[in-house]
Swiss-Prot record:
Substrate binds at residues 105, 137, 168, 247. Its main location: cytoplasm. Homotetramer. The gene is ldha. One of its GO terms (cellular component) is cytoplasm. This is L-lactate dehydrogenase A chain. It is an enzyme of class 1 (oxidoreductase). Interconverts simultaneously and stereospecifically pyruvate and lactate with concomitant interconversion of NADH and NAD(+). Pfam families: Ldh_1_C (PF02866), Ldh_1_N (PF00056). GO terms for molecular function: L-lactate dehydrogenase activity. It is found in: Cytoplasm. Pathway: Fermentation; pyruvate fermentation to lactate; (S)-lactate from pyruvate: step 1/1. It catalyses: (S)-lactate + NAD(+) = pyruvate + NADH + H(+). Gene3D superfamilies: Lactate dehydrogenase/glycoside hydrolase, family 4, C-terminal, NAD(P)-binding Rossmann-like Domain.
Length: 331
């Protein structure tokens, strides 16, 4: 008799029970790992699967996380073969070429489309009912690409979009007012990145509209220069990349925030990238961020935001820019 047999007496053969809240992270770069750790520390899933083409890096990261199993409640698995991802509830795609210092998010496009042509069919093969969350940049275009390549209905393909931009925005407003970001309600919509749209008309604290107190807020004529806050949001990522070489922690936490709303069926409203054709005067098949309700089925509803004419025009301009790029893509 082995030590194990002397220690444990077997009662029954265990039936395999599938995890109802398995999460997969594709890509073990800086963003993938920050997302994985954030998901683990929030205790969101029973099983976390990780995939990447870089076999040694993947193996090392998985092993490193597994060494912390005692401190976690999640089973961690990893392999370059996508069978390890089978039956995931949410699949987070962070893989792709990384943005270089000074490189625009749009410049990354075709490089990442080619990577997606391999990744997406593999995800669909093993988790045909999952919710796909795209994080790789340029996120709005790649969410469209993932939607096209997956054949999934639109409510199951979500881009992380401006969830992080809005968090940065709320943080900076909070800094200016000496308040916690959760008490500063503010939304950034449209494209994730350089042409994102701050909805100044909706900025409020405890239901008090800041534009009601300062009608010039967000415009050139504003003596308090609130507009600079949005510029800081846009420049924020570039600044972090310049200083430490990449961004990771905040986007990782932002991803975990979205995954939580889905897995726990919270019906929370998040600014995420979805098909906006027919909204805010957008005519083309583009994905942009608008406030959306997230739950167990994915993206169930969209909130009708009251945008000013100028804001609406910016959203349409973003849509045109994105469509200009999308129609050139070889899918």
């Amino acid at each position: 008799m082995s030590t194990k047999e002397k220690l444990i007496s077997h009662v029954m053969k265990e039936e395999p029970v599938g995890s109802r809240n398995k999460v997969t992270v594709v890509g073990v770069g800086m963003v993938g790992m920050a997302s994985a750790v954030s998901i683990l520390l929030k205790d969101l899933c029973d099983e976390l699967a990780m995939v990447d083409v870089m076999e040694d890096k993947l193996k090392g990261e998985v092993m490193d996380l597994q060494h912390g199993s005692l401190f976690l409640k999640t089973k961690i698995v990893g392999d370059k073969d996508y069978s390890v991802t089978a039956n995931s509830k949410v699949v987070v795609v962070t893989a792709g070429a990384r943005q270089q210092e000074g490189e625009s998010r749009l410049n990354l496009v075709q490089r990442n489309v080619n990577i997606f042509k391999f990744i997406i069919p593999n995800i669909v093969k093993y988790s045909p009912n999952c919710i796909l969350m795209v994080v790789s940049n340029p996120v709005d275009i790649l969410t469209y690409v993932a939607w096209k390549l997956s054949g999934f209905p639109r409510h199951r393909v979500i881009g992380s979009g401006t969830n992080l931009d809005s968090a940065r925005f709320r943080h900076l407003i909070g800094e200016k007012l000496h308040l916690h970001p959760s008490s500063c309600h503010a939304w950034i919509v449209g494209e994730h990145g350089d042409s994102s749209v701050p909805v100044w008309s909706g900025v409020n604290v405890a239901g008090v509209s800041l534009q009601g107190l300062n009608p010039q807020m967000g415009t050139e004529g504003d003596g308090e220069n609130w507009k600079a806050i949005h510029k800081e949001v846009v420049d924020g990522a570039y600044e972090v990349i310049k200083l430490k070489g990449y961004t990771s922690w905040a986007i990782g936490m932002s991803v975990a925030d979205l995954v939580e709303s889905i897995i726990k069926n919270m019906h929370k409203v998040h600014p995420v990238s979805t098909l906006v054709q027919g909204m805010h005067g957008v005519k083309d098949e583009v994905f942009l961020s608008v406030p959306c309700v997230l739950g167990n089925s994915g993206l169930t509803d969209v909130i009708h935001m009251t945008l000013k004419a100028e804001e609406e025009k910016q959203v349409q301009k973003s849509a045109e820019t994105l469509w200009g790029v999308q129609k050139e893509l070889i899918l």
